């Protein structure tokens, strides 16, 4: 099982001009205590991800992910009910990292969050000007 190490930030200002790609994502969650199952639908592909609880700082947690046939992912997505989101994800290269900036729609309209995956909790990274308050954890 892989460990996911990431930091998250609110976003302010123009971030779209440096995006190299954008994709529409629908995802739903089934949560049981500190463990969550995420069903993600991207175009014609589906994924299931199980995430464990985060460490004290919230930057690291165990994650297991597999691709699913789209028809199965759509069935599981329906089971998530109101625990679903709709967003556009922009990929923005900055230095040696790719920032994933999510612009939410629907009930979360106006929320924009950037995340960067790291190889360790202590890895340094170049902070782009569009990053605002850190919300990791």
What function would you assign to each model-found segment?
Residues 1-137:
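Phosphate-end processing signature that detects enzymes handling 5′-triphosphorylated RNA
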């Amino acid at each position: 099982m892989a460990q996911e190490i990431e930091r998250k930030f609110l976003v302010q200002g123009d971030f779209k001009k440096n995006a190299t790609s954008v994709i529409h994502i629908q995802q739903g969650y089934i949560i049981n205590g500190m463990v969550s199952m995420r069903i993600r639908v991207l175009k014609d592909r589906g994924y299931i991800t199980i995430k464990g609880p985060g460490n004290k700082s919230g930057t690291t947690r165990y994650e297991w992910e597999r691709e699913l046939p789209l028809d199965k992912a759509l069935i599981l997505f329906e089971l998530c009910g109101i625990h679903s989101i709709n967003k556009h994800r922009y990929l923005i290269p900055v230095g040696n990292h790719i920032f994933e900036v999510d612009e939410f729609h629907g009930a979360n309209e106006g929320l924009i969050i950037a995340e960067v995956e790291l190889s360790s909790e202590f890895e340094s990274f170049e902070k782009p000007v569009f990053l605002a308050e850190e919300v990791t954890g």
